[in-house]
Structures are given as C-alpha cells and as structure tokens.
C-alpha cells in the first residue's frame, strides 16, 4: 500500500529528502497463523498508442514537387528526373517503404510472482519471488527481470523486536538506440533486402545512407545493460520502559550496472565510418543509519508524544569506462576492448556525498479534538558550499476535530469534519556533487607532423565553480478540511496551499565568453498556490451490486517571482518573472497568408502560402527581438482524475479517467525539423497550396530557411482526456475453487492507455511533444490466486 504526504508538517520530519513530497510504501508482512501462498500472473499485448503518420512515397513526391514548383524549378513530370535524382526510378514505380513501421513490432510483457507468508507468536516472515519478461515495441528491445523479497520480524524478548527487509533485483536489458530520430526523415523508398533475403545496409542508390534497420543484421549491434540491485535494512525496536521506545535502523542500497555497447561500421551509430565499442561499470552504494527515541504518555484528556532522532547518509558512486573504434573482430563485441585499434579512451570517476540530520517532533492532543504537531529538523549536505551546508527546517500543524464538538455531535448526517492548518519550511540540495569546486574536461585534438595526423588530449574548463551554492528553501502554508457525510458514504478532503521557494537551485546558461555553458546557482524565487480536492463516494452498496467513485481535482498556479540580479527576464533560459518556469516563448503563428492577402503579405516580405506571424508591436516587420511573446506554459490549468469501481456478484469493473487541461507543448511532430518545408521527407501534414488554401502548414518551398518562423508551428494545445484503464474481473465461486484448496481465484483483463481525446492527430500528448519512443497501449490478461 502507498500513502502520499505533501503538506509541510507531514513531510518535515524527512528533511531535504522529502522536499517534493513523501510516498510511504508499506510492504507485505507475515502474520501469525497458517501459511498463506498467493500467485499473481499476467500477460500483456503491447502496441503503439499513437504516432504521427509519415508521408508515403507518392505523398512525398507531391510534396517535393510542390517545394520546387514554389521556387519555379518544377513545371511538370518532365522535371521529375531532375528533382528526384537517384530516387527517380523508385518514384516512377511507387516503391513505397515505411521505415518507421519496419522498426516496430507487437510487444508483450509477462509476469509471474509467488508470495509466501507465515508466522508464530515470536517470528513472522513474508517471502516473494517475481519474474518478468518484456519484448518492446521496437525490435531488439527486450528485458528480463528477477526479483526476490524477504521481510522478517522476530521478537527476541518481550521488549526487544528485530526486523529485516531485503529486496534483490537482477535486470538484463537489450536496448536499441532510438532509431526514430533518423527513420522519420528517411525517404519512403529503398531496397530493404538483398536478393538473398538479408538486410541491405545501404538501401539507397547514394551508397552512403545507412538503413535504419541495419542494427538487425546478425552480430552488427548489441547494447546490453545488466543491473544488480540489493536494497535492505535491519533494525531493532527496544521498549526501554513503558512508553519509552528506542528504534535504530541501518539501511544499505547497492546498485551495480554494467553497460556494453557495440555497433558495426554499417549501423546508424557507426555511420559507415568505423565500428565502435564501449563498456561501462557503474557502482552506486548508499548507507543510512537512523535512530529515534520516542516517549508518549496520557494524563487525563491530554496526550503528549515526543520524538528525537538523528540520521547519517552516505553515497559513493564509482564508474569505469573504456571505448574506442575499429575492433579487430566484430565478434568481440564489447567484451575485449583491448582489440580496439583507434581512438581508445579510458575514463573513471569517483563521487562521494554525505548528509547528517538531527530532528525532533512533538505531538499533542487534547480530548481527541484538538491536535498540534511541531517539528524541527537540521540537515547538513556535503554538496553545498562550505559555509552554506547546514539548514534548519521547522514546521507546525494544528487540527480541530469539529464533529466531536457538542454542537455538531448530534448531526446524524455528519460522520467526520476536521479542520487542518500547517506551515513549514523544507530544504532541497538536489544538485550533483562538486558543483562548488569547478573542474576540467578532456578532449582530443588532431595535429599534423610530416603530413601524418596525430592526436593529443587537451583540457578545458567544464564545470563552473560556485562558492556560494546553498539550500533551496520552500515555505508552505496549507489550510485543509477532511469531511464525511452519511456514515462516510461521501468523504474526502479539500486543501488550499501556497508554496514560496527562494534560492531556487537550477542550471542557468552563462555567456560563452566565460568558457562555460551551464552553471548551477541559486537563481531566484518562485511561488506555487493551488487547490487539491479529493471526493470518495459510495453510490450504491447493495448485496449484489456496489458502485464507488473516487474523484480528484488539482489546480496549481506557478510563477517566478524573482530572478538573479533583479532582472525580470532571462530569455536564454526561458525564465520570466510572473510566469511559470516551463514557459514557451516565441513567435505567434496566426495562420497562413492567403491569396487575397498578397498585398498585405508583401509589406512583411512574405507571399501567399507562407506562415503568418503576428506583428506584436505593429512596426511593419517581424523579428525575434520585438515580436516574440510568452505563448503558454507546460503547467496545466487543472488536472482531474475519476475512478469508478462497479461490483456485481462475482464481477468487478474499474474505469479510470484522467484529464489534463490547458497545457502547451512544443511538438516535434509540428515544429521546425519535422516539417521539412524544403521538400524533404517527414511527417504527413495538411500543407498549403493554391488548390488547398489551408491555415495549418505553409506551402513547401525549396529555398525557405527562416527557422524561427517554422518553430512557431510546434506550439500546440497539449490538453487531453484519457481513459487510462478499464479492468474487468471475475472471482470464481468458492464451490469451484475449493477442490484445489484455494481461498480466492480472480481472473481479469485490462485495457490500458487505449483511449485518448485531444486536439492532436495521431499523437499521444502524454509523451510531451517528443518523437522518440512512442507511448504504449496494453491489453492485459491476468490471474490472482490465494491459498
């Protein structure tokens, strides 16, 4: 089970690690009684949720002809040979190839897990095993995962209890390089296979363009990642005397990742120039030791709980990497880097970070009606500058159970009414180590001696030092109310909050004259304020039929209130005072110049068919300095969730819907680079021609090159409504399953991510505008068995 903590008071005790909220995960534990065994398994069929259509060969041919016609270089079929060159024969024969489709496959996922638990009065345990395998949507993407979990608790004496939790995961992944950023823009033709059926790595007549499926040639490509991850903790709880408890927990988290990558000469990575291989070993070790002393007592109507503690955290990350070009034999893959003949590179790194914390909490209750919590925590982080490493973070919360008051106690319709107030300060030090110290990077330079090219390494300033880097601090005020009516058939909560963050930790662009590009800094202040509403209703609750609804609504308004150096804008980073951090700033497209607007278009140096940009300052010209505006934000106006659960006899149905409204995306499918206005192949769009005077996309034009105006095509409304999941289940009757001594068997099927409603055609806006790996939809079939 999971519990999400968000307000300042409940997260304050977790310090900087809870700066963005806390998710409490309660894992399964053993219980006293007979052994319980459960099995859960499922199989899913995965496919692409949505992906933009590409131009087929005839559509691309028309598109390219139009681009040349606009420039007066195409007047009819007699000019085809001139403009298509080596593609002319394919265009004549309509030899169509969809390269993106060639990469894809129907994916699948399979999981089997077994859980065993038991316990005595002194010892309980829970043991779980899981195996999961997956074949991705892209060929050569696959994964196998093995997982084992042990939870153990032992009562050593009447007042001393020991516990241990261990999770081990082993992951074997084959990961194909993202081929979409190339295949989308390939001309939709080519000789995909040789006469013998093997893959043709040079499918075009130019002798240099590598096939996007060249990696599928046996032995030509391998990108494998092995992950071994061990997480555990051991702890003891000692009831020293009545109401006084000492708890000590030691945690350990070790992750080892080995990544090996090989690409032969004729692959997308090799690009026809050389084979390449690299191998990386990365180790990440986290240690923690947490100790708390808690005391509580009750005196009459008063209850007081006190807690004090400290925690130590340490992280050590090591990495070793070797790489180079031109293996003696491709069969070596990445297992024998000594066989690399050129551009050999060896690198290593060691990163250590530490944190120390001291904290305390007071909980006070009077008559179970009036509650107060006060928390104080001090964190020290090694990643910050020497004189700024320690931060103090207090919080206070008050609550009033109003339904316990005499004037409300007899209101039968009221089940719960609790008013909450909280205020607290949290800290964030989430930056990489050594940002305060600066550092050098290494690169290879070529030089000539006796007309022979040689290589030598040079060093350059790669990391900007910041000797004043300190804590990012967020002050959060929250007022909330928990409510329940009609014996909690209607229940929920309403929260109104305001967060003010100062000394924001962000990377900012710095002038190139400094020799650097980016630097971490405390750059300014932001404010978030909003409303969160949760409503749970039991609509029907009869013997054979029930219907429950869970509704969530979130509204957040984010803005920058101050930037470094007192400026109101930082255009290079896209930051503007009074607006969201994730703001889109650019030229505003208001349509396409039409034929009857030729005279007006000419005033701006344009002509019908080109993008019409709004002249913001009405000076008669379009330029980046005066006509770019804030177009929108990636932060939505609101987010809603609606979950309905129906049960009829042994059947259950769950439908979960998700609505994200008012966000702007910069879509790679629409913007400069994807819309190849000069006639190159790409995404299929509705473009302007004299015969098709649309306002969506401009006319193809061979000589057009104004990228800032083309970039305006990419800003789109990213609002969407999704039916995220539909699950239908059936619980087998007890009379059926008793013969195999099972206590419960449930079979189910789910549709995940199947239905999306948005303004975007053939694109899932949850992907955020990117054209890389597409979103997945799943048809899942599963079974749960308990013995």
What are these model-derived regions, one by one?
Residues 1, 8-17, 47-51, 450-452, ...:
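N-terminal plug
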Residues 1-8, 40-42, 46, 126-128, ...:
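Periplasmic plug
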Residues 8-13, 30-33, 45-48, 122, ...:
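Short beta-strands and strand-coil junctions in structured, solvent-facing domains, enriched
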Residues 21, 29-139, 177-179, 215-224, ...:
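Residues embedded in well-ordered regular secondary structure
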Residues 38-91, 321, 435, 521, ...:
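Conserved small-residue
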Residues 110, 145, 151-160, 165-170, ...:
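Extracellular/periplasmic, surface-exposed regions of secreted and cell-surface proteins
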């Amino acid at each position: 089970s999971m519990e999400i903590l968000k307000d300042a008071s409940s997260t304050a005790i977790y310090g900087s690690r809870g700066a963005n909220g806390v998710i409490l995960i309660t894992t399964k534990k053993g219980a006293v009684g007979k052994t319980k065994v459960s099995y859960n398994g499922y199989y899913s069929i995965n496919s692409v949720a949505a992906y933009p259509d590409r131009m087929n060969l005839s559509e691309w041919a028309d598109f390219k002809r139009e681009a040349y016609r606009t420039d007066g270089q195409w007047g009819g079929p007699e000019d085809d040979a001139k403009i298509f060159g080596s593609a002319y024969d394919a265009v004549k024969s309509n030899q169509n190839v969809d390269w993106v489709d060639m990469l894809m496959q129907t994916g699948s996922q399979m999981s089997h897990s077994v859980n065993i638990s038991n316990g005595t009065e002194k010892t309980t345990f829970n043991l779980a095993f899981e195996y999961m395998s997956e074949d991705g949507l892209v060929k050569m993407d696959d994964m196998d995962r093995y997982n084992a979990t042990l939870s153990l608790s032992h009562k050593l004496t009447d007042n001393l209890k020991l516990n241990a939790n261990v999770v081990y995961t082993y992951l074997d992944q084959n990961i194909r390089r993202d081929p979409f950023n190339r295949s989308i823009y390939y001309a939709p033709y080519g000789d995909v296979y040789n006469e013998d059926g093997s893959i043709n790595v040079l499918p075009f007549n130019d002798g240099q363009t590598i096939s996007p499926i060249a990696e599928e040639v046996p032995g030509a490509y391998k990108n494998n990642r092995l992950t071994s991850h061990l997480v555990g903790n051991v702890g003891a709880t000692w009831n020293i005397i009545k109401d006084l408890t000492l708890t000590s927990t030691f945690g350990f988290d070790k992750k080892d990742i080995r990544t090996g990558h090989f690409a032969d000469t004729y692959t997308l990575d090799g690009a026809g120039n050389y084979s390449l291989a690299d191998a990386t070993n990365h180790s990440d070790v986290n240690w923690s030791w947490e100790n708390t002393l808690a005391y509580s007592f009750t005196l009459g109507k008063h209850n007081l709980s006190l807690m004090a503690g400290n925690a130590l955290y340490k992280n050590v990350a090591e990495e070793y990497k070797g790489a180079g070009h031109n293996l003696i034999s491709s069969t070596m893959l990445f297992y024998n880097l000594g066989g690399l003949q050129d551009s050999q590179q060896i690198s290593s790194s060691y990163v250590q970070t530490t944190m120390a914390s001291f904290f305390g909490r007071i909980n006070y209750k009077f008559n179970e009606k009036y509650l107060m919590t006060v928390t104080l925590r001090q964190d020290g982080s090694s990643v910050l500058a020497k004189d700024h490493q320690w931060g103090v973070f207090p919080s206070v919360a008050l609550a009033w159970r109003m339904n316990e008051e005499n004037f409300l106690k007899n209101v039968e319709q009221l089940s719960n009414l609790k008013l909450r107030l909280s205020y607290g300060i949290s800290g964030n030090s989430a930056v990489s180590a050594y940002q305060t110290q600066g550092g050098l990077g290494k690169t290879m330079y070529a030089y000539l001696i006796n007309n022979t090219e040689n290589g030598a390494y040079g060093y350059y300033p790669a990391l900007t030092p910041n000797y004043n880097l300190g804590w990012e601090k967020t002050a959060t005020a929250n007022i909330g109310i928990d409510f329940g009516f009609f014996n909690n058939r209607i229940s929920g909560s309403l929260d109104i909050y305001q967060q003010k963050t100062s000394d924001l930790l962000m990377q900012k662009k710095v002038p190139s004259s400094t020799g650097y590009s980016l630097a971490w800094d405390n750059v300014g202040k932001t404010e978030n304020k909003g409303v969160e509403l949760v409503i749970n209703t039991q609509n029907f609750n009869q013997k054979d039929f029930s219907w429950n609804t869970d509704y969530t609504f979130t509204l957040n308004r984010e803005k920058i209130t101050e930037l470094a150096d007192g400026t109101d804008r930082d255009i290079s980073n896209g930051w503007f005072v009074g607006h969201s951090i994730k703001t889109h700033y650019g030229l505003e497209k208001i349509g396409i110049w039409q034929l009857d607007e030729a005279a007006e278009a000419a005033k701006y140096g344009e002509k019908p068919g080109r993008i019409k940009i709004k002249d913001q300052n009405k000076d008669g010209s379009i330029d980046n300095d005066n006509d770019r505006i804030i177009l929108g934000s990636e932060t939505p106006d609101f987010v809603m969730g609606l979950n309905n659960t129906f049960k009829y006899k042994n059947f259950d149905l769950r439908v979960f819907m998700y609505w994200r409204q008012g966000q702007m995306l910069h879509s790679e499918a629409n913007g400069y680079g994807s819309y190849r206005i000069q006639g190159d192949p790409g995404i299929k769009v509705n473009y302007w021609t004299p015969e098709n005077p649309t306002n969506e996309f401009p006319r193809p034009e061979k000589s057009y090159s104004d990228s800032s105006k083309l970039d305006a095509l990419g800003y789109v409304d990213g609002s969407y409504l999704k039916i995220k999941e539909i699950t239908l289940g059936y619980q087998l009757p007890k009379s059926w399953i008793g013969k195999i001594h099972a206590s419960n068997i449930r079979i189910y099927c789910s549709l995940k991510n199947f239905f999306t409603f948005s303004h975007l055609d053939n694109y899932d806006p949850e992907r955020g505008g990117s054209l890389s790996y597409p979103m997945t939809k799943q048809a899942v079939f599963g079974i749960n068995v308990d013995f």
